[in-house]
Amino acid sequence: MLDNAMQYSHRLLSEVVQPGDCVVDATMGNGHDTLFLSDLVQSSGKVFSFDVQSQALEQTRTLFEKNQHSLDNVELIHASHDQIQKYVSQTITGAVFNLGYLPGGDKTIITHSESTIAAVQQCLAQSQIGGRTILVCYYGHPGGKEELEQLLSFVTDLDQHEFSCLRYEFINQINNPPILLCIERKK
Protein backbone atom coordinates (compact mmCIF):
# COMPACT_ATOMS: atom_id res chain seq x y z
CA MET A 1 0.00 0.00 0.00
CA LEU A 2 1.13 3.52 -0.69
CA ASP A 3 2.00 5.65 2.34
CA ASN A 4 -0.37 8.46 3.23
CA ALA A 5 1.16 11.93 3.48
CA MET A 6 1.97 11.64 7.19
CA GLN A 7 3.54 8.19 6.81
CA TYR A 8 5.56 9.36 3.82
CA SER A 9 6.76 12.45 5.69
CA HIS A 10 8.04 10.20 8.47
CA ARG A 11 9.76 7.91 5.98
CA LEU A 12 11.45 10.84 4.24
CA LEU A 13 12.69 12.20 7.57
CA SER A 14 13.82 8.84 8.93
CA GLU A 15 16.06 8.43 5.87
CA VAL A 16 18.16 11.48 6.81
CA VAL A 17 17.72 12.26 10.53
CA GLN A 18 20.21 10.53 12.83
CA PRO A 19 20.71 10.34 16.60
CA GLY A 20 22.29 13.57 17.80
CA ASP A 21 20.77 15.72 15.04
CA CYS A 22 18.85 18.97 15.45
CA VAL A 23 15.36 19.07 13.90
CA VAL A 24 12.31 21.34 13.82
CA ASP A 25 8.60 20.62 14.14
CA ALA A 26 7.33 23.92 12.80
CA THR A 27 3.67 23.19 13.58
CA MET A 28 3.49 21.19 16.81
CA GLY A 29 -0.24 20.52 16.71
CA ASN A 30 -1.08 17.49 18.84
CA GLY A 31 2.59 16.51 19.16
CA HIS A 32 2.78 13.39 17.00
CA ASP A 33 5.58 14.67 14.76
CA THR A 34 7.42 16.04 17.80
CA LEU A 35 7.29 12.59 19.42
CA PHE A 36 8.43 10.92 16.20
CA LEU A 37 11.34 13.36 15.80
CA SER A 38 12.31 12.97 19.46
CA ASP A 39 12.67 9.22 18.90
CA LEU A 40 14.78 9.79 15.77
CA VAL A 41 17.28 12.19 17.33
CA GLN A 42 17.35 10.30 20.64
CA SER A 43 18.71 11.80 23.86
CA SER A 44 21.79 13.25 22.16
CA GLY A 45 19.72 15.29 19.68
CA LYS A 46 17.34 18.21 19.92
CA VAL A 47 13.80 18.90 18.68
CA PHE A 48 12.54 22.47 18.51
CA SER A 49 8.75 22.39 18.30
CA PHE A 50 6.65 25.50 17.56
CA ASP A 51 2.99 26.43 17.84
CA VAL A 52 1.04 29.66 18.33
CA GLN A 53 -1.65 27.92 20.40
CA SER A 54 -1.03 27.06 24.05
CA GLN A 55 -3.48 24.17 23.59
CA ALA A 56 -0.94 22.52 21.27
CA LEU A 57 1.80 22.67 23.90
CA GLU A 58 -0.55 21.17 26.50
CA GLN A 59 -1.63 18.37 24.15
CA THR A 60 1.98 17.61 23.25
CA ARG A 61 2.99 17.38 26.91
CA THR A 62 0.03 15.05 27.49
CA LEU A 63 1.02 12.87 24.52
CA PHE A 64 4.57 12.54 25.85
CA GLU A 65 3.29 11.67 29.34
CA LYS A 66 0.84 9.12 27.95
CA ASN A 67 3.70 7.48 26.02
CA GLN A 68 6.02 7.68 29.05
CA HIS A 69 8.43 9.64 26.89
CA SER A 70 10.80 12.25 28.26
CA LEU A 71 10.77 15.82 26.96
CA ASP A 72 14.49 16.19 27.81
CA ASN A 73 15.52 16.50 24.15
CA VAL A 74 12.54 18.68 23.17
CA GLU A 75 11.96 22.40 23.45
CA LEU A 76 8.27 23.31 23.19
CA ILE A 77 8.05 26.89 21.96
CA HIS A 78 4.89 28.99 22.17
CA ALA A 79 5.63 31.12 19.10
CA SER A 80 4.99 31.30 15.38
CA HIS A 81 7.14 29.16 13.15
CA ASP A 82 8.40 32.31 11.47
CA GLN A 83 10.47 32.82 14.65
CA ILE A 84 12.63 29.72 14.09
CA GLN A 85 15.91 31.63 13.74
CA LYS A 86 15.23 33.39 17.04
CA TYR A 87 15.27 30.02 18.84
CA VAL A 88 17.38 27.70 16.67
CA SER A 89 21.01 28.54 15.92
CA GLN A 90 22.15 25.02 15.02
CA THR A 91 22.30 23.42 11.59
CA ILE A 92 19.19 21.29 11.12
CA THR A 93 18.79 17.94 9.39
CA GLY A 94 15.03 17.97 9.08
CA ALA A 95 11.95 20.11 9.51
CA VAL A 96 8.29 19.24 9.23
CA PHE A 97 5.23 21.44 8.74
CA ASN A 98 1.59 20.28 8.90
CA LEU A 99 -0.29 23.21 7.43
CA GLY A 100 -3.90 24.10 8.09
CA TYR A 101 -5.46 24.17 11.56
CA LEU A 102 -4.99 22.31 14.83
CA PRO A 103 -6.98 19.05 14.67
CA GLY A 104 -9.70 19.30 17.29
CA GLY A 105 -8.94 22.99 17.78
CA ASP A 106 -10.27 26.33 16.59
CA LYS A 107 -10.63 26.01 12.80
CA THR A 108 -10.38 29.77 12.38
CA ILE A 109 -6.76 29.73 13.58
CA ILE A 110 -4.89 28.58 10.48
CA THR A 111 -1.42 28.75 9.02
CA HIS A 112 -0.78 31.52 6.49
CA SER A 113 1.55 31.54 3.50
CA GLU A 114 3.49 34.64 4.59
CA SER A 115 4.65 33.19 7.91
CA THR A 116 4.99 29.69 6.47
CA ILE A 117 7.23 30.82 3.61
CA ALA A 118 9.32 32.88 6.05
CA ALA A 119 9.68 29.80 8.26
CA VAL A 120 10.58 27.55 5.32
CA GLN A 121 13.22 30.06 4.20
CA GLN A 122 14.72 29.98 7.69
CA CYS A 123 14.76 26.18 7.72
CA LEU A 124 16.40 26.04 4.29
CA ALA A 125 19.04 28.57 5.36
CA GLN A 126 19.94 26.39 8.35
CA SER A 127 19.58 23.02 6.64
CA GLN A 128 22.63 20.84 6.20
CA ILE A 129 23.40 19.34 2.80
CA GLY A 130 21.01 16.42 2.40
CA GLY A 131 18.65 17.90 4.97
CA ARG A 132 14.93 17.80 4.24
CA THR A 133 12.11 20.24 4.90
CA ILE A 134 8.70 18.59 4.62
CA LEU A 135 5.41 20.43 4.16
CA VAL A 136 2.17 18.48 4.50
CA CYS A 137 -0.45 20.83 3.08
CA TYR A 138 -4.04 20.43 4.23
CA TYR A 139 -6.04 22.81 2.07
CA GLY A 140 -9.73 21.93 2.35
CA HIS A 141 -10.47 24.79 4.76
CA PRO A 142 -11.03 28.49 3.99
CA GLY A 143 -7.66 30.01 3.14
CA GLY A 144 -6.05 26.63 2.54
CA LYS A 145 -6.04 26.70 -1.26
CA GLU A 146 -4.48 30.17 -1.28
CA GLU A 147 -1.70 29.04 1.06
CA LEU A 148 -1.07 25.95 -1.06
CA GLU A 149 -0.88 27.98 -4.29
CA GLN A 150 1.62 30.42 -2.80
CA LEU A 151 3.73 27.61 -1.35
CA LEU A 152 3.77 25.77 -4.68
CA SER A 153 4.89 28.96 -6.40
CA PHE A 154 7.65 29.47 -3.82
CA VAL A 155 8.90 25.86 -3.95
CA THR A 156 8.74 25.70 -7.76
CA ASP A 157 10.98 28.78 -7.96
CA LEU A 158 13.75 27.36 -5.73
CA ASP A 159 17.09 27.00 -7.53
CA GLN A 160 17.37 23.44 -8.86
CA HIS A 161 21.13 23.53 -8.33
CA GLU A 162 20.64 24.09 -4.59
CA PHE A 163 17.45 22.13 -3.88
CA SER A 164 15.54 19.08 -5.08
CA CYS A 165 11.79 19.50 -4.65
CA LEU A 166 9.22 16.71 -4.60
CA ARG A 167 5.42 16.82 -4.73
CA TYR A 168 3.54 13.74 -3.47
CA GLU A 169 -0.24 13.54 -3.77
CA PHE A 170 -3.13 11.20 -4.39
CA ILE A 171 -4.88 12.41 -7.52
CA ASN A 172 -8.00 10.20 -7.44
CA GLN A 173 -9.17 10.83 -3.86
CA ILE A 174 -12.03 13.07 -2.80
CA ASN A 175 -12.17 15.69 -0.04
CA ASN A 176 -8.86 17.44 -0.75
CA PRO A 177 -6.31 14.84 0.39
CA PRO A 178 -3.16 16.50 1.73
CA ILE A 179 -0.29 17.27 -0.61
CA LEU A 180 3.24 16.64 0.61
CA LEU A 181 6.14 18.81 -0.53
CA CYS A 182 9.71 17.82 0.26
CA ILE A 183 12.65 20.17 -0.22
CA GLU A 184 16.10 18.60 0.02
CA ARG A 185 19.24 20.76 0.19
CA LYS A 186 21.78 19.72 -2.46
CA LYS A 187 24.55 22.21 -1.65
Residue ranges of model-derived segments:
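Conserved SAM-binding motif I beta-strand of class I
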Residues: 46-51
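Conserved beta-strand signature within the Rossmann-like core of class I S-adenosyl-L-methionine
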Residues: 27, 126-137
